Amino acid sequence: MNIQLYKALWGMEGSYRDQLTRAAQAGYTGIEAPLPPRDLEREFKDLLAELQLYYIAQVVTSVPHQETFAEQVRRATDFDPKLIVSHSARDGMKIEDQLFFFEAALKIEQEVGITIGHETHRSRAMFTPWTTRRLLEEFPELSITADFSHWCCVTETMLEDYAEDMEVAIRRAVHIHARVGYAQGPQVPHPGAPEYSRELAAFETWWKRIIQYRSEQGFSYTSMTPEFGPANSGYMHTLPFTGAPVTDLWEVNEWMSKRISERMTP
């Protein structure tokens, strides 16, 4: 089982050339990012080819959700992504509207021929373990991008009481967002800090189970994106009064990448 590490552009600074060059020099398989602005599409494509980076496209739905999903996914195909990660629908939608959305989403996925992992994200349809399980059982072909940090935050637990839901999610994950959360938030200040060793161990256990299951199913690789976020997003902890981030964003994601490379091979 090969682990493919992707660099999230979230929080990076500089031009696309600056960002993608840094990712390539750091040894990442590819990048994960939203679709580029239309006036930068050619530059973005050329840089991916020049630097030999794969691309995971991110799409974010808004009202009307079916239409915005379809438009973004079809546009994403122009960039030959290895995978599409979607922030899909909303948590407050009626269940019948969510079912209608995901039925349509599966048809679009089949049309474009690219795997789509619907992210387990706060404010979205898959914002809890139990709502996600319900959708996955309703649609056997539906896949997720596993970002369990959001579920820890929503449930205010380390998911001890949701073993059956977690088992379903683990078996349906096609991509991992490797960020460590805790019971009161989606991102610990630093995953290497000893005071968060319990949280790190829990997340590594979940990730290993995903990787092991994919290996048993005959997949040759699992893709993972270390995705600790910046201070201006509300994810990175900051010092009071100054607003200074408590750690360096590049360093914390590099720490996670190195840890994955050393520990995640089954």
Q: What is each residue range found by the language model?
A:
Residues 27-29, 50-53, 80-82, 138-144, ...:
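Glycine-enriched alpha-helix->loop->beta-strand junction motifs that scaffold or abut catalytic
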Residues 61-143:
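Active-site acidic/histidine proton-transfer and metal-coordination neighborhood
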Residues 1-8, 31-33, 53-60, 84-86, ...:
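Hydrophobic faces of well-ordered beta-strands that scaffold small-molecule active sites
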Residues 2, 13-22, 138-143, 152-266:
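Histidine-acidic metal/acid-base catalytic patches
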Residues 42-63, 104-112, 138-139, 204-209:
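Alpha-helix-loop-beta-strand connector modules within alpha/beta enzyme cores
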Residues 48-52, 73-76, 102-103, 134-136, ...:
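Short, hinge-like loop/turn segments at secondary-structure boundaries
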Residues 1-73, 77, 254, 258-266:
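N-terminal pre-domain/capping segments
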Residues 9-11, 35-37, 61-63, 88-92, ...:
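Active-site-proximal loop/turn and secondary-structure-junction residues that shape catalytic pockets
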